[in-house]
């Protein structure tokens, strides 16, 4: 640990790294406080900050030669087969590690790799290359099984822990597996942190963007007070401020042959309202809607919009245009609504629900990976990050209020490289609830812009369902619908 005065040059470097965000660190008294330039306190500067050779320091960091925490179960014939770009990442990592060892820098690297790149399998290859006992830390139980499958395939001795850390510590008294896969809340236990700091050399923080290390979290404290010998941050959407804890970044652009299309399903709706809707509308401008909870609740009961989503999905699925569908909502009740309606139409052999409250969901996810046709309905919380169904070819986004990081993670669910190249996303920018009409349009436009500008999707207007609408629609309504489409197209 390095306790340093917050001199101007150090403060300026930290501020630049975090893109001007507020910086919070542990001071010499152990308090987690906002850093001010010229403060009389000394601050605990994270070990990973010095992993970049751009940071000047006279500090010397210990190397792997000082430990003997080696994996005993490596079989070179079990090493995973990598694609050329994945091999390039491994080559970059090994090259950077050599330089870090030569310069006596901490062996900390952020792997900033696109959604669908194959970060898990690439990291498993690196684990076998290093041959060091490893901790894999995930933000939630749902990612445990994804890692377990890959570690098993590599043939490494391992253990997963999703229950209490106290029972795990008892087991570790008699056994010390080569790879330990845990949820991040285990790091709230100091005894566990001390144990892995002593007996494990490599620490892998999966989905590192889900942790805000400018907050006083268990992961923040672990990295500050029990820094591992080697560390990887894995993410497709890194937080700038987290660089303070892992300051060497490898980012290799992913060239793809995928044909990615985002369809904008426009439709004119007559205003729709109920007593329930009117009551929720009253809360839109209040503190209870700070995170747009009521905005999403209104979307969940917007019957005309929900019917449009169902009609579009049914039409596309029946035509065979799409075959392995992910339907995403923000709220659980919205998910259950779509699941029940689709279950009535297609049956339990085709329609599945990704419910975080059901312990059997991970096993169900495994079972549908080999199916040729299925519809998987889930929430942004469960499936937005880390869902491992590589064969997905289409995504229906039923919610609207999603931040940029979540959008990129969500779209990544349908951007995994497979033999089939077509990928399709459907968004619905209109609502029949007039009080949120423009708000929903703006939120959905953000999804469209990010998908096109950053992720390489081609934007197209979806016309099939609208063209099949009955001709009996009043002339005034048809004219308003046309004007609505023109307005929407001008706003894109």
Swiss-Prot record:
Which GO BP terms sit in this record?
DNA-templated transcription termination
Query: Which residues are involved in binding ATP?
Result: 113-120
* InterPro entries, sorted: Helicase/UvrB_N, Helicase_ATP-bd, Helicase_Restrict-Modif_Enz, P-loop_NTPase
- Tell me the Gene3D superfamilies matching this sequence: P-loop containing nucleotide triphosphate hydrolases (3.40.50.300)
> Where in this protein would one find the motif DEAH box, according to its record?
206-209
Q: Which domain of life is it from?
A: Viruses
Record localization: Virion
Keywords from UniProt, A to Z, are: ATP-binding, DNA-binding, Helicase, Hydrolase, Late protein, Nucleotide-binding, Phosphoprotein, Transcription, Transcription regulation, Transcription termination, Virion
Per the record, the major location class is virion
Q: What is its EC number?
A: 3.6.4.-
* Domain Helicase ATP-binding stretches: 100-256
User: Can you supply one Gene Ontology CC term for this chain's record?
Assistant: virion component
Gene Ontology MF, one: ATP binding
| Role of this protein | DNA helicase which seems to act as a postreplicative transcription termination factor. Involved in ATP-dependent release of nascent RNA. Forms a stable complex with single-stranded DNA, and to a lesser extent RNA.
State the similarity comment.
Belongs to the helicase family. Poxviruses subfamily.
The record's subunit annotation is:
Interacts with OPG087. Might be part of a transcription complex composed at least of OPG087, OPG110, and OPG145.
Task: Give the protein's recorded name.
Answer: Transcript termination protein OPG145
């Amino acid at each position: 640990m390095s306790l340093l005065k917050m001199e101007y040059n150090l403060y300026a470097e930290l501020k630049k790294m975090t893109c001007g965000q507020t910086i919070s660190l542990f001071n010499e008294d152990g308090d987690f406080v906002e850093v001010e330039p010229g403060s009389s306190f000394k601050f605990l500067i994270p070990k990973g900050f010095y992993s970049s050779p751009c940071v000047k320091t006279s500090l010397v960091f210990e190397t792997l030669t000082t430990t003997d925490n080696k994996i005993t179960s490596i079989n070179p014939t079990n090493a995973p087969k990598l694609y050329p770009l994945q091999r390039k990442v491994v080559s970059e990592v090994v090259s950077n590690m050599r330089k870090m060892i030569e310069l006596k820098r901490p062996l900390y690297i952020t792997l900033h790799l696109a959604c669908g790149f194959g970060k898990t399998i690439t990291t498993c290859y690196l684990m076998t290359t290093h041959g060091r006992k490893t901790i894999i830390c995930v933000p939630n139980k749902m990612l445990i099984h994804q890692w377990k499958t890959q570690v098993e395939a590599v043939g490494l001795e391992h253990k997963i822990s999703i229950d209490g850390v106290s029972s795990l510590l008892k087991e570790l008294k008699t056994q010390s597996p080569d790879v330990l896969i845990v949820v991040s809340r285990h790091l709230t236990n100091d005894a566990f942190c001390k144990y892995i700091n002593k007996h494990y050399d490599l620490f892998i923080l999966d989905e590192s963007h889900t942790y805000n290390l400018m907050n006083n979290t268990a992961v923040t404290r672990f990295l500050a007070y029990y820094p591992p010998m080697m560390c990887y941050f894995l993410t497709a959407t890194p937080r700038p401020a987290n660089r303070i804890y892992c300051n060497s970044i490898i980012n290799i652009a992913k060239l793809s042959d995928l044909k990615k299309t985002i369809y904008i399903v426009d439709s004119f709706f007559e205003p729709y309202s109920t007593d329930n809707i009117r009551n929720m509308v009253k809360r839109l401008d209040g503190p209870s809607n700070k995170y747009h909870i009521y905005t999403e609740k209104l979307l969940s009961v917007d019957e005309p919009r929900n019917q449009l989503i169902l009609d579009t999905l049914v039409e596309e699925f029946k035509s065979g245009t799409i075959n392995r569908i992910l339907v995403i909502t923000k709220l659980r009740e919205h998910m259950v609504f779509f699941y029940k309606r689709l279950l009535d139409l297609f049956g339990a052999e085709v329609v599945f629900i990704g419910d975080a409250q059901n312990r059997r969901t991970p096993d169900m996810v495994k079972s549908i990976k080999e199916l040729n046709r299925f519809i998987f309905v889930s929430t942004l919380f469960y499936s937005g990050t880390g869902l491992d169904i590589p064969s997905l070819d289409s995504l229906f986004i039923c919610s609207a209020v999603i931040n940029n990081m979540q959008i990129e993670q969500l779209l990544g669910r349908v951007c995994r490289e497979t033999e089939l190249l077509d990928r399709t996303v459907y968004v619905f920018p209109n609502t029949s609830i007039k009080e949120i009409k423009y708000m929903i349009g703006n939120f959905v436009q953000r999804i469209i812009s990010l998908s096109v500008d950053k992720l390489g999707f081609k934007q197209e207007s979806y016309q099939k369902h609208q063209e099949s609408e009955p001709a009996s629609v009043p002339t005034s309504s048809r004219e308003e619908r046309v004007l609505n489409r023109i307005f929407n197209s001008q706003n894109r």
